[in-house]
Amino acid sequence: GYFGMSDWSLMDYGCYNNEGYTPIGYSAYEKNFMGWIEYTEPVENTRYTLPVFNSKNADNDVAVKVSSSNRNEYYIIENRARQGWDRYMPAEGMMITHVTYDPQKWESNSVNNYSTQGMTIIPADNNLDNKSYDALAGDLWPYNGNDALTDDSRPAAVLNLGSQRRMGKPITELTLNPDGTASFWYVRGELPKISTPQITSIDHTTNGVTATWSHEPECDVTYSVEVRPHNNLESLLLLA
C-alpha cells in the first residue's frame, strides 16, 4: 500500500496511537480545513520560530505554508512534540506535509490511493516506511544531521504538478531549540562577504596614533587593533 499520512494523522493510522487510547492530535491541515487556524505565509530571508503545535494554547497553533507556483500544491511546516494528544507519536520535531490538492480525489475519498500521494509527509530520513514504529522515528525534522529541505537535498523539495518539479524555495537550518520551539530559515539570502580592512592612513603623535582604514558600510562590523611597542613584550588591544 501507499504511505499516506500513516501515524501522523488522525484520519490515517494515527487514530490507533497508544492502542487507540491516545489518538494523535489534529494536524495543521486539518485545523485549517475546519477554519480553526490560518497559515503563516513566509517572507524570504526570514528565520521563523514555531511554538509547539496542539499545546492547548490556540496562539501556539502556528504553521507555515510554503506555496508553489500552482495554488493546489504546497508544503505545511508545523512543530510537533510528544505532549497532550501527541504524546504517543513515533518522534517529535518539525513535520513537513506535502499537499497536492485534487478536488476529485478529495470528493471520492481517494486522496492517497495512487502513487502520486495527495497528502503525505516529507520524511527527514528520506524513508517512507511505516512497517514498524522504529521506521517512523526519522520522519520529522531535523534528523541525524539532516536539517535542510532544498531542491538538491535528500529528500529533495519535489513537486508533483507542472514542469518545474522543484519547489525552488530552500528551507534550511531546521533546528529544535532547548525551550521546545523549532526554527528554520526560509529562502535565506547569501551572507555578505567581508573583505580584509586596508589601512589608508596612520598619523603618529606624541601621545598616540590615529589610524583610518577601509570599512564595510553594509555590515555591522567590530574591528580590533593591536598596538605593540618595538620590544614586542607587551601589547594593547583597542576596539573600534
Feature locations, PLM:
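Extracellular hydrolytic enzyme modules, especially secreted metalloproteases
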Residues: 1-89, 100-102
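Residue-level detector of conserved, well-ordered beta-strand and adjacent loop positions
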Residues: 12, 78, 212-214, 226-228
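Extracellular low-complexity, Gly/Ser/Thr-rich intrinsically disordered linkers
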Residues: 53-191
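Short strand-connecting beta-turns/loops that link adjacent beta-strands
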Residues: 70-71, 178, 204-207, 218, ...
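Solvent-exposed strand-loop boundary residues in beta-sheet-rich modules
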Residues: 100-102, 217, 229-233
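Beta-strand secondary-structure signal
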Residues: 183, 210-212, 224
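Pro/Thr/Ser/Gly-rich low-complexity, intrinsically disordered linker/stalk tracts
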Residues: 190-220
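Recognizes extended acidic, P/S/T-rich segments that occur
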Residues: 222-240
